[in-house]
Design a protein with these regions (language model features):
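A composition-driven surface/loop motif
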Residues: 1-458, 462-490
Length: 490
């Protein structure tokens, strides 16, 4: 109920409901083609979904107008479903003036909270599952907050959740299947909060998992299965921005079949939590990749591509693009393999461990400090935890093979070794060289080019390794916001 210009605080035109004043409004039952809209500038609205099944053919199922303040509450113990059709996409249907490109559309300057103890399933046949707008001088601050509820999103066209300004995923249980990004924010994306359990997020399929110009994971239990970057701090529309990725808590179990694990176009900081990230064992994938500083300490190292470990547990494994990395290891770490040139982009590299192989990392006394099962073959493994002691030996055991490594602290360089040879290479169990190989060229001769000369690149230049840049966020440019607040016609 509500009060205002309309006696009940709302208007109904066919199957289109428009909320015009503050109040609590409960919607239930089912509708094959209808819509709910909170009028521009309307604040203090609580929209209760109480067993609602709603499909909208040519616009958003729920629209929160510009400068509105709305709480969408999913009622305890209820199952609710929102969906649209392919017509709710003005890229493919430019003649559709009512298209909002999302099942739930939150316009510029809107403050929207999606919460409750019930379950909501969103099927985005048009474009995005949820789209949140930007902060503007005219419309005010914008944000989207998700907490408590069980939220399932199927987005076979584009993003499951796409925000332009501020996106807080505080708690709840999210299951996402997306054609492009699972959870994307043009600016600030916060997952969980310090001192909380945070959300449970299961991203079963996506191109990129979590993406924001400033990406913070503070708590939660996150599983990601991606075809590109699992986590990405980037925005191709921002040319001068201090991109940051900070992992301070929670648990992340991430795998990508064709991109980087964690990819930051600026700084990458892992200061706590448990991180397990696997990348496909090809020459153009990095478990950890950053253009600025990679760090797990509170103070980044300026102008240095580095990983600094100060807390938490980190297992980063997979392939590499051939770029050497420096590490600031405040908490000691042990590295097996190398990020040195291991092959042409896309080529498969020799593995320290094979896909689905059980492995352990043991200290000098044979105590396991880590054990797991490989998601894929890996020629590079970085491990750090509070149990790792600097200058101590640790052995990676997988099947009948073992690889030795020494934990290091301070500034550590992986060097430019050859695809898995440094700092540790996979050996026969007895540490001997393969049979028939004594480490020398045949006949004891050295390999030389004709006349003993080294070829020069054109103009005397040496080849340049891949840049390590994060993947551009194609398709994630802010979508144009509809300026019309006319009630959609069903």
């Amino acid at each position: 109920t509500g009060a205002g210009d309309s006696p009940a605080g709302y208007e109904i035109d066919g199957t289109a409901l428009t909320i015009t004043d503050s109040g609590t409004y409960t919607v239930s039952d089912s509708c094959a083609d209808g819509s709910i809209k909170v009028k521009k500038g309307t604040t203090g609205v609580t929209l209760v979904l109480d067993g609602l099944t709603l499909t909208s053919e040519n616009t958003a199922a729920i629209t929160c107008g510009k400068s509105s303040e709305v709480t969408i509450l999913v009622s305890n113990g209820t199952e609710n479903s929102l969906s649209d059709t392919e017509q709710n996409n003005d890229d493919n249907y430019p003649e559709n003036e009512n298209a909002e490109n999302a099942v739930i559309k939150c316009k510029d300057g809107s403050l929207v909270t999606l919460c409750g103890d019930g379950e909501l399933t969103i099927t985005a046949n048009g474009k995005n599952g949820i789209k949140s707008g930007a902060t503007t001088d005219e419309d005010g601050e914008a944000s989207l907050t998700i907490r408590d509820l069980t939220l399932n999103i199927d987005a076979p066209v584009n993003d499951a959740i796409n925000a332009e300004q501020l996106l807080n995923v505080e708690s709840g249980t999210l299951t996402i299947d997306a054609a492009d990004d699972a959870i994307h924010c043009d600016l600030v994306l916060n997952i969980g909060a310090d001192g909380t359990d945070g959300p449970t997020i299961d991203i079963t399929n996506c191109c990129e998992g979590l993406e924001g110009a400033e990406l913070n994971v503070c708590s939660g239990d996150i599983t990601i299965n991606a075809s590109d970057d699992c986590l990405n701090a980037a925005n191709s529309d921002l040319t001068d921005y201090d991109f940051t990725m900070t992992i301070s808590g929670g648990t992340i179990d991430a795998y990508t079949s064709g991109g980087d694990g964690f990819d930051s176009n600026g700084e990458l900081a892992i200061t706590g939590g448990t991180v397990v990230v696997w990348t496909a064992n090809t020459a153009d994938n990095e478990p950890l990749d950053a253009d600025g500083t990679i760090t797990t300490a509170t103070t980044p190292v300026a102008d240095l591509t580095a990983i600094t470990v100060s807390g938490g547990t980190v297992l980063a494994a997979g392939g590499s693009s051939g770029m050497g990395m420096n590490l600031e290891a405040a908490q000691p770490c042990v590295i097996y393999g190398s990020t040195g040139f291991g092959g042409m982009p896309g080529s498969t590299q020799s593995s320290l461990i094979a896909a689905d192989e059980n492995f352990t990392i043991e200290d000098a006394d044979g105590n396991a400090v880590y054990s797991g099962t490989a998601r894929c073959g890996a020629n590079f493994i970085l491990f750090s935890s509070a149990d790792v002691v600097a200058d101590s030996a640790y052995t990676l055991k997988a099947g009948d093979s073992s690889t030795e490594g020494t934990a290091q602290s301070g500034t550590v360089s992986t060097g430019m070794g050859m695809g898995g040879g440094f700092p540790g290479g996979r050996q026969k169990p007895d540490g001997e060289l393969p049979e028939g190989f004594d480490g020398q060229m045949p006949n004891g001769e050295k390999s030389e080019l004709p006349d003993g000369e080294v070829p020069e690149m054109p103009s005397g230049e040496r080849p340049t390794p891949p840049s390590g840049q994060g993947s551009p966020t194609d398709g994630n440019a802010p979508a144009g916001d509809s300026t019309s607040d006319t009630t959609p016609t069903a």
